[in-house]
Amino acid sequence: MSVIKRPGAFILLASGLSFGGSWRGALVDLRCFESEEHNVNPGDSLTYVDRNRSWEIRFCAPRLKSKSFAFVDADGLSFRLDPDGNRRAAELVRKTGKRDLFQVVVNGEKNGNKLMVDSIAASN
């Protein structure tokens, strides 16, 4: 019985480490977004209840000079982009111009809280 459990456990753990896919969400300036995420009252124990994620995403929309980016999915989870993803995102922002809300489709691989980006495109 344990012989069957070990390969199954290994496959389950390995699949949780990284997986490829396509995701829709918002592109944000990483420094701004992380600053907003950490801008909480130290005595507040309900930091996720008091958040206005939509405002944070709009406030931290990427600028033409942004160099580091994060992707925020529909559930409000944020993922840092890898260096190649940052390069692709900066190029996209320069081509598209400034927007109040920068919706994108990202193709790549999630590894923890980081996205290894294969492609990124603006979406409506």
Regions found by a protein language model. Name each.
Residues 10-14:
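Gram-negative bacterial Sec-dependent N-terminal signal peptides
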Residues 21-124:
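OB-fold and OB-like single-stranded nucleic-acid-recognition modules
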Residues 1-9:
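Bacterial N-terminal signal peptides that target proteins for export
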